[in-house]
Swiss-Prot record:
Family, similarity comment: Belongs to the protease inhibitor I57 (SspC) family.
Subcellular location: Cytoplasm
Record lineage: Bacteria, Bacillati, Bacillota, Bacilli, Bacillales
More info: Inactivated by staphylococcal serine protease (SspA).
Species this chain originates from: Staphylococcus aureus (strain N315)
Name by which UniProt lists this protein: Staphostatin B
Function: Specifically inhibits the cysteine protease staphopain B (SspB) by blocking the active site of the enzyme. Probably required to protect cytoplasmic proteins from being degraded by prematurely activated/folded prostaphopain B. Also involved in growth capacity, viability and bacterial morphology.
UniProt KW keywords: Cytoplasm, Protease inhibitor, Thiol protease inhibitor, Virulence
GO molecular-function term, one example from the UniProt record: cysteine-type endopeptidase inhibitor activity
Keyword S-adenosyl-L-methionine: no
Length: 109
């Protein structure tokens, strides 16, 4: 059985540059890792009170975003854009102790 994680990125578009918004949009969509049987759904919006995450850092040069849950800021996530079909997701504690290996996800069509 697949584990499904919803990530609702909450941010104010008026405070971001066009390049930063474009960078975030690279990650919007449905992604899956068939080997680990994990799927993630990344979207923008605060239309739900569940699974809300705020963006901590946007690295437009490396197409990377760092974010954490609004409910639990101790764990941070890093998304790296690999290509149009693949992203990498890595988790770590806010103090930087205990960083996980990146997990590769493939875009679901």
């Amino acid at each position: 059985m697949y584990q499904l994680q919803f990530i609702n990125l909450v941010y104010d578009t008026t405070k971001l540059t066009h390049l930063e918004q474009t960078n975030i949009n690279l990650f919007i969509g449905n992604w899956s890792n068939h080997q680990l049987q994990k799927s993630i759904c990344i979207r923008h919006g605060d239309d739900t009170s569940h699974n809300q995450y705020h963006i901590l850092f946007i690295d437009t040069a490396h197409q990377r975003i760092k974010f954490s849950s609004i409910d639990n800021e101790e764990i941070t996530y890093i998304l790296d854009y690999d290509d149009t079909q693949h992203i990498l997701m890595q988790t770590s504690s806010k103090q930087g102790i205990g960083t996980s290996r990146p997990i590769v996800y493939e875009r679901l069509v």
